[in-house]
């Protein structure tokens, strides 16, 4: 069995599920999952867990993510991104400066509340929102709290001849953030219709775009029996507090017994040497093995 983490560069035009399906065929391994859905049009880092690493994938999805994208001011779309149909157009504000945009972007820092877009996989009454949207049905969408730790403009304002304005941005955000909704809400705060015209995920769960592999690159390496694209399972627990255990504690964990450890963290990644051997969960004053990986 193959075990480990893959830093996949998902290309535009495929869903996260498509990427997993292709890797299952390529690696001849059924036990593969991804750490955080990317929309089909979005390029970027998609953490992939293989074999035993699928047992820690949930801890990768909790990690914050970094995106780089582009906002277009002047019209909104059904999907809040460039793939949708135009819903409304508006003239740019009489005064639209880089200083005003920057100042407005700072108002989104910290904890904010978002309403997920209709074209999203959020479920309401057992159905995904995009199913309601495609059927032309309206439904009340649940608002959610997310955290924005960075939101900044990374290019000058580019005014076009057809009355639009575009600029690039970078955002660091918590799990569950809809960046296209952030682009729409920014436009609303500036008093103009808007949408997200480009997006790529540049970092997720400690993995970066610079070191990511495309499916084509992985296929080429597999054909040469080269597996260096596969990272150790330890990458999957990089965001959990680490606790090094001794031989006696290792034996106790292997039997599923509780341990008394000097920590107050709700979850710990237990290491024996350089290897992660279990995820421990705080129960009263002791730690119980939640997932044993040996």
Curated annotation (Swiss-Prot):
Keywords: Isomerase, tRNA processing. Pfam families: TruB_C_2, TruB_N. InterPro entries: PsdUridine_synth_cat_dom_sf, PsdUridine_synth_N, tRNA_psdUridine_synth_TruB, TruB_C. It is an enzyme of class 5 (isomerase). Disulfide bonds: none annotated. It catalyses: uridine(55) in tRNA = pseudouridine(55) in tRNA. One of its GO terms (biological process) is tRNA pseudouridine synthesis. CDD domains: PseudoU_synth_EcTruB (cd02573). The active site is at 39 (nucleophile). The keyword Magnesium does not apply. PANTHER family: PSEUDOURIDYLATE SYNTHASE TRUB1, TRNA-PSEUDOURIDINE SYNTHASE. Belongs to the pseudouridine synthase TruB family. Type 1 subfamily. Responsible for synthesis of pseudouridine from uracil-55 in the psi GC loop of transfer RNAs. This is tRNA pseudouridine synthase B. The lineage of its organism: Bacteria, Bacillati, Bacillota, Bacilli, Lactobacillales.
């Amino acid at each position: 069995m193959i075990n480990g983490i893959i830093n996949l560069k998902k290309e535009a035009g495929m869903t996260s599920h498509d990427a997993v399906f292709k890797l299952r065929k390529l690696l001849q391994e059924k036990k593969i999952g991804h750490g955080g859905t990317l929309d089909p049009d979005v390029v970027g880092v998609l953490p992939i867990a293989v074999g035993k690493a699928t047992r820690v994938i949930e801890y990768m999805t909790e990690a914050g993510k970094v995106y780089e994208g582009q906002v277009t001011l002047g019209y909104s779309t059904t999907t809040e991104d460039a793939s949708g149909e135009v819903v409304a157009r508006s003239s740019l504000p009489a005064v639209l400066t880089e200083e005003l945009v920057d100042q407005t972007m700072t108002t989104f820092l910290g904890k904010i509340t978002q309403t997920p877009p209709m074209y999203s996989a959020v479920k309401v009454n057992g159905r995904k929102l995009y199913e309601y949207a495609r059927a032309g049905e309206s439904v009340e969408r649940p608002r959610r709290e997310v955290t924005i730790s960075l939101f900044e403009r990374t290019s000058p304002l580019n005014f076009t001849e057809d009355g639009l304005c575009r600029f690039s941005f970078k955002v660091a955000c918590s799990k569950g953030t809809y960046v296209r909704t952030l682009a729409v809400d920014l436009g609303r705060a500036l008093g103009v219709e808007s949408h997200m015209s480009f997006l790529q995920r540049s970092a997720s769960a400690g993995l970066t775009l610079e070191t990511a592999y495309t499916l084509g690159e992985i296929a080429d390496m597999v054909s040469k029996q080269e597996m260096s694209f596969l990272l150790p399972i330890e990458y999957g627990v990089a965001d959990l507090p680490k606790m090094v255990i001794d031989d006696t504690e290792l034996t106790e964990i292997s039997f599923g017994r509780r341990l008394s450890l000097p920590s107050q963290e709700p979850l710990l990644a237990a290491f024996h040497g350089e290897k992660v051997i279990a995820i421990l969960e705080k129960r009263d004053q002791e730690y119980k093995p939640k997932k044993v990986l040996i």
